[in-house]
């Protein structure tokens, strides 16, 4: 319970002159050695009608003098007990501390308010159960470097604690203490600073890590080169441009950076270095971009650096495109407003040669490729499976399919390819009922293209039709065979004519 006097003192904001010196002293509003006291709002006091102090500063001074009554007054005026404890520690007023100790709670809460390392240490000692490790940890939080300078030798040999404090200082970005620990104590895992710097994206911390690292090894050291390479890979992977530049100050290869930048589409990094590297490296980067399935903007940046000239490595490019099934660069070269570069046919040829049906169909849709082109390529490359599947999908009607296959044979020069298409036609007709005109046309077609076996098969099938018309067809085929010197076709046609003459009544 507050006394009446305390209630008056707590809420008195009036001028003190009318009260007289005796009343002021009886109210406890006189501070020995300083003068009368008057409350000014909630945060300040007026001392001796002249000096204005913050309530926290005032209670700290009063506590350092051991003036318990004035401390009590300032607590009524919303002064902080924490500053009272700090003041008592400064004046070594342990009786005052003892009185308020139970109200303090955790002494560690006072530590951030203390600037003097000696007072800082005294405050920490109030909790008798705390260890040196606790003192060091709070010193890191509050940037109290003198604590380390005073007791740092006690950490020598305690590798675990040194590592723990070092990493804590890195996480809290306390650069002064990091330097002191790094240069004065043996840190087992000095590289931990880099991992934390990457997470925090703290370039200052990152640079400090190299400063510490170079205190242990030279830039020619194999381990140092390995570390630099790892850092460059990670920084470029994450797009940390400033970190990349910082690492390159100490060594490392720009190529390491560029390949990661391409893979993860970090164009800012790529644009910075792309015009400083040889063309051969750019070509490798373009191939890597295909492998990594890079973005359109990344490809354009790379291609523009070589003026879109891909001729010197077009074979490697096509091989990589087909191998990784990523056609974006083919599309970009085709979309150029001027000087379009058409690699569609070249890529299609490799796809037909090495890829599956599904992959080829996807390419056909993407580049609007006619099925005839694909079927003819498949025929030249002896891909029987593709001929059948693509022609079946393109022309569901069998007669329509035969018509298109015949047109392809007519426009092809590749002998084996033509034969393959004609055998495909023959396989279709084996399951199709042809009328007389269709059967005769197909027979003549085989004669024109010197398909001996197929011609013989069709001749056997045509005997069911009108013999007179069939004989006329055979004479026509014989004329074609003689004109082109197709000996076997001529012999077959002649034999069939003789047989018809033999069985036909005269």
From Swiss-Prot:
Function: Plays a role in virus cell tropism, and may be required for efficient virus replication in macrophages.
Highest taxon listed in the record's lineage: Viruses
InterPro entries per record: MGF_505
Coiled coil: none
Family: Belongs to the asfivirus MGF 505 family.
Alphabetized UniProt keyword annotations: Early protein
Lineage: Viruses, Varidnaviria, Bamfordvirae, Nucleocytoviricota, Pokkesviricetes
Regulation: induction: Expressed in the early phase of the viral replicative cycle.
One Pfam entry name: DUF249
Name of this chain's protein: Protein MGF 505-9R
């Amino acid at each position: 319970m507050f006394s009446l006097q305390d209630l008056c003192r707590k809420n008195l904001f009036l001028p003190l002159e009318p009260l007289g010196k005796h009343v002021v002293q009886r109210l406890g509003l006189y501070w020995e050695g300083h003068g009368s006291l008057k409350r000014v709002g909630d945060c300040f006091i007026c001392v001796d009608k002249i000096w204005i102090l913050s309530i926290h500063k005032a209670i700290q001074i009063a506590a350092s003098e051991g003036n318990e009554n004035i401390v009590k007054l300032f607590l009524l005026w919303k002064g902080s007990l924490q500053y009272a404890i700090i003041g008592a520690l400064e004046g070594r007023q342990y009786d005052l501390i003892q009185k308020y100790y139970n109200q303090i709670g955790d002494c560690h809460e006072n530590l951030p308010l203390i600037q003097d390392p000696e007072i800082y240490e005294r405050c920490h000692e109030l909790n008798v159960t705390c260890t040196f490790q606790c003192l060091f940890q709070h010193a890191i939080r509050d940037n109290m470097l003198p604590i380390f300078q005073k007791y740092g030798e006690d950490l020598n040999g305690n590798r675990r604690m040194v590592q723990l404090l070092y990493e804590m200082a890195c996480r809290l970005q306390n650069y002064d203490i990091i330097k002191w620990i790094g240069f004065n104590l043996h840190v087992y895992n000095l590289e931990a600073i880099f991992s934390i710097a990457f997470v925090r994206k703290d370039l200052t911390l990152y640079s400090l890590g190299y400063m510490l690292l170079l205190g242990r090894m030279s830039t020619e050291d194999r381990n140092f080169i390995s570390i630099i390479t790892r850092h460059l890979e990670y920084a470029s992977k994450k797009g940390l441009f400033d970190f990349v530049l910082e690492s390159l100050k100490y060594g490392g290869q720009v190529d390491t950076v560029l390949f990661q930048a391409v893979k993860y589409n970090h164009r800012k990094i790529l644009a910075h270095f792309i015009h400083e590297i040889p063309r051969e490296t750019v070509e490798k980067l373009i191939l890597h971009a295909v492998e990594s399935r890079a973005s359109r903007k990344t490809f354009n940046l790379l291609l523009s650096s070589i003026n879109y000239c891909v001729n010197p490595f077009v074979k490697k490019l096509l091989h990589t495109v087909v191998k990784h099934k990523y056609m974006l660069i083919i599309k970009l070269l085709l979309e150029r407003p001027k000087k379009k570069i058409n690699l569609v046919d070249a890529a299609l040829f490799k796809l037909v040669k090495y890829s599956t049906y599904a992959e080829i169909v996807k390419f056909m849709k993407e580049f609007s490729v006619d099925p005839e082109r694909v079927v003819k390529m498949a025929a030249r490359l002896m891909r029987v499976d593709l001929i059948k599947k693509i022609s079946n999908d393109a022309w569901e009607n069998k007669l329509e399919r035969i018509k298109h296959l015949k047109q392809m044979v007519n426009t092809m020069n590749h002998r084996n390819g033509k034969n393959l298409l004609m055998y495909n036609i023959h396989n279709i007709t084996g399951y199709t009922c042809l009328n007389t005109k269709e059967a005769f046309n197909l027979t003549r077609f085989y004669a024109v293209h010197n398909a001996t076996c197929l011609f013989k098969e069709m001749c056997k099938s045509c005997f069911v039709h009108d013999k007179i018309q069939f004989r006329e067809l055979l004479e026509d085929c014989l004329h074609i065979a003689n004109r082109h010197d197709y000996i076997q076709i001529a012999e077959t046609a002649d034999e069939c004519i003789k047989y018809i003459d033999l069985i036909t009544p005269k």
